[in-house]
Amino acid sequence: MAIQSDSLSSRPDAPRLVAPAPASPNEESIERALRPKALQEYVGQQRAREQLEIFIAAARKRSEALDHVLLFGPPGLGKTTLAHIIAHEMGVQMRQTSGPVLERPGDLAALLTNLERNDVLFIDEIHRLSPVVEEILYPALEDFQIDILIGEGPAARSVKLDLQPFTLVGATTRAGMLTNPLRDRFGIVSRLEFYNTDDLAHIVTRSAGLLNADITPEGAREVARRARGTPRIANRLLRRVRDYAEVKAGGRIDTEAANQALAMLEVDPQGLDLMDRKLLEAIVHKFDGGPVGVDSLAAAIGEERDTIEDVIEPYLIQHGYLQRTPRGRMATQTTWRHLGLQPPSGSQPSSGDLFGA
């Protein structure tokens, strides 16, 4: 049975197609269906994949729990997918939660005491763990024990509980916000990088097969090169292009259909959308190309500072459209040319395309 796609939204307040975070619970369910189950199926992140393959094989050979794993990098690159793959390859169950959900020590203790031998506990947004919960986690990671306080007041006493050996997989987009004691307790640390166009085209082709969509190699590449180096965005664009092709192109996604669909969706050949162009135009037209502080920029375009720093900027910086300097944000020569303008003398040169054409 083919995986059902979500509907094409034309609401003005619809989430950005090129946003790296999941847009809706429905999208998350589609992502789960498209997710590779084993390392052999996992595309890209060659260094992290090869390391995990060795570490998992060694742990299985010794019948031990895999060492604790920290996965960090921009959103949408496959941290959750890798956590599921680790559990699958180890032949164990995975419990999933997130840092903000674990408000009290008891929340974490309940999860830890229910883990079976060598199970995987996946904590997304681990940088958002509260300090009191983090303190409970330290002895669990080091000694597979937790201290529970029973009773209240003068009669309260601490009881030490033994845990089954387990693997913590932590995921974060903000590795710098992790405390040093927590970071030091991870034996395996992997940074996930933006994907190149070839790997994304492979992912798009695989996903199209699961979605029962007819796509040519050229059509897959056209979708991939606008996906901002991010598999989640590639799969989202694929679903929208698939909708267009079914209505306007006889169901076949070739270069022409992909180009027409993405033009309709206002995603340009470089993967920039309206929000990206709005930010770049503000720097160029309102602040003469910069430098401009992020707070001033946020006010100029009506966005939150965190949205600019976490969602919009990473791609623009990696792709050579924006420079972050001590004095503020500056547009590069690539930005001026992209907007059809002549770069002023002394403007910043581009750092180039890091994802591959």
Swiss-Prot record:
Reaction it catalyzes: ATP + H2O = ADP + phosphate + H(+)
Name of the protein: Holliday junction branch migration complex subunit RuvB
Record InterPro entries: AAA+_ATPase, AAA_lid_4, DNA_helicase_Holl-junc_RuvB, P-loop_NTPase, RuvB-like_N, RuvB_C, WH-like_DNA-bd_sf, WH_DNA-bd_sf
Span of the signal peptide: none
Species assigned in the record: Bordetella avium (strain 197N)
Homology family: Belongs to the RuvB family.
Keywords attached to this entry: ATP-binding, Cytoplasm, DNA damage, DNA recombination, DNA repair, DNA-binding, Hydrolase, Nucleotide-binding
Disulfide bonds listed in the record: none
UniProt region (Head domain (RuvB-H)), positions on chain: 269-357
Polar residues bias (residue ranges): 1-10
NCBIfam families per the UniProt record, alphabetical: PRK00080.1, ruvB
Enzyme Commission code: 3.6.4.-
Annotated region (Disordered), positions in chain: 1-30
Biological role stated in the UniProt entry: The RuvA-RuvB-RuvC complex processes Holliday junction (HJ) DNA during genetic recombination and DNA repair, while the RuvA-RuvB complex plays an important role in the rescue of blocked DNA replication forks via replication fork reversal (RFR). RuvA specifically binds to HJ cruciform DNA, conferring on it an open structure. The RuvB hexamer acts as an ATP-dependent pump, pulling dsDNA into and through the RuvAB complex. RuvB forms 2 homohexamers on either side of HJ DNA bound by 1 or 2 RuvA tetramers; 4 subunits per hexamer contact DNA at a time.
Binding-site list for DNA: 305, 324, 329
Binding site for Mg(2+): 80
One term of GO molecular function: four-way junction DNA binding
Localization in the cell: Cytoplasm
